[in-house]
């Protein structure tokens, strides 16, 4: 009898220990980030001019990178960048591999169910890049055409809605543009600012841009939903950066223009 009681007690304690362990694992993405002085930032470093590496260099640079560095400085954190495929950023936030994703991520309702977003910091839109001699002169001409996109993006979602379009998915926007250059697709559906930057930098490729109407969207910094303290501190830093002109200076560095004054403080996605 005593032996059975002892066994029951031991079994119960063991079960409690397992539950406690599982409970700790389930919350690691949010709680560990709050305690650590290191801010692990995930980015997909192929999205010029937001995050990229110059040829022959391992150093990250870009609009998002400068913003992330400034936020880390203002929140008293040591920064650690991790290069992550774009469609792996949300899972990396969930499992605690990274604390924050700074990667030109559009705030959408679907993503808001999985992550916590900062206030919007950039207004974007969509565009199709084609060759100057292309038969595609407008959006109506995209029907039945072969279009390159970066997988997991709002551009990919949009391309899949085009009647009869053959959509080719790529890991990186740069790969989608390379496929266009090599003649493997007839157009690349990507973010407008990236299209503008690329076409301006590669005038020898004779490309042109067709802006996609009614596709206004906003980028936000993504974090684990459990880490509300980090979301609050990031928003505080972004607010200060707007007020003291730091964010505008970063805009001018990368886009040669001032930050738009009508970017909303809050945004519920689309």
Write out the residue ranges for each language-model feature:
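Extended ligand-binding regions for polar small-molecule ligands
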Residues: 65-66, 70-74, 151-153, 220-259
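Periplasmic-binding protein-like
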Residues: 45, 123-130, 196, 200-235, ...
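C-terminal motif of bacterial Sec signal peptides marking the signal peptidase cleavage site
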Residues: 20-24
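Flexible hinge/capping segments at coil-to-helix
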Residues: 130-147
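Short helix-initiation/N-cap motifs at beta->coil->alpha
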Residues: 65, 81-92, 134, 151-154, ...
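Extracytoplasmic small-molecule ligand-binding "clamshell" domains
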Residues: 35-104
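A ligand-binding cleft/hinge motif common to bilobed small-molecule-binding domains
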Residues: 91, 105-113, 158-160, 181, ...
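Ligand-binding clefts/hinges and TM-proximal coupling segments of bilobed small-molecule sensing domains
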Residues: 27-29, 157-171, 207-211, 239-270
